[in-house]
Amino acid sequence: MKKIGVILARLQPIHNGHLALIKKASEENEEVHVFIGSADKFNERNPIPINMRHDMAMAAIVERGIKNVSIHWLDDLDDESNNSHDWGFYLYSKVVSEIQQSNFTIYYSDGFEIITSWFPGFILRNNVSLSLLARGAVED
């Protein structure tokens, strides 16, 4: 089984915090999969279209020489404020469908309570692990 890191971010726009997470995940995994959330949204909260977010992310990743990263688009389940188990199952199924593996590590910078609310305990115990990069640990 491959060691796979997963990052979920809207990238509105991509910034040093996102890149630090991607770099950390790249150093610790064989593959990193970045899922750009709210891919189906183009509004005041999501003013940058998904194709631009994708292109900016790829350019920043390549510019920094970060390897083994794939980028995927992820539509919202319904409302981006949905932090239910429905969202967790939706996210988990989308990730597993893309990476073809049921075990992975989610890299995040805040919101532990939110992330853990997405998944029933059995998924966190058996399939998904979490890795924190505190916002204060990010260099400008």
Identify the role of each PLM range.
Residues 1-140:
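Nucleotidyltransferase catalytic core that binds NTPs
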